[in-house]
Amino acid sequence: MKFKIFLAIFAMIFFTSCSSDKENSSNENTDNASLSQSENTDFTLKFLDGRKMYVKYHEQEFNFDDTAKAKLFVFFTSWCEPCKAEIPHLNNLNKKYQDRFEVIALFLEENKEQEILTFIEDEKMKFPVAIGENNFVFSKVLNISSIPTMVLFNAKGEKVKEYLGLIPEEMLDIDIQKAIM
């Protein structure tokens, strides 16, 4: 009986989300730690492939320079096991809806680019990855306090849904279908 209780507690902790302690220590290094959802800010997400995405946040509305697709922003770290477990599902969804939707991963770590590239290769990530201090800015604007956290936006930049912890692929699929309509 004790083993079953232990197993249930362990599973609940594992599948809910990772602690944000490591994230918070990294966030202390940014100049934008005081941002909140009430402030206006503009910033640029920088991707490993050289692409950039301009994000404007004014009066609690988001504007992305790329309005062709709905977006699922995935905030994660390399040490978070639930984050790693989601990657195959996110690859599937990114491929399934590639014409109208994209997954965008945001590393909340200050790793060297080569470490991130190795992680991407090891975990077989097949969607864009943003790196840099503006990932922390975006996480502060969205009030991200744990990982994994995913935030779904439609193509107009309207926030559709926020997810905490490990989310079933089927649930994401249904919400993505609504966001791309």
Q: Which residues fall in each region the model found?
A:
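N-terminal targeting signals for export/organelle localization
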Residues: 1-53, 181
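A short beta-strand-turn-helix
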Residues: 44-71
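Loop/turn elements at helix/coil->beta-strand transitions in domains of secreted/extracellular proteins
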Residues: 68-70, 99-102, 126-128, 155
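Short pre-active-site segment immediately N-terminal to redox-active cysteine/selenocysteine motifs
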Residues: 69-71, 76-79, 146
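Hydrophobic beta-strand anchors of alpha/beta hydrolase catalytic cores
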Residues: 72-73, 103, 150
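Short, thiol/selenol-centered motifs that function as redox-active sites or metal-ligating centers
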Residues: 80-84
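Structural microenvironment flanking redox-active thiols in thiol-disulfide oxidoreductases
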Residues: 85-123, 134-139
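Thiol/disulfide oxidoreductase modules built on the thioredoxin-like
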Residues: 122-126, 133-177
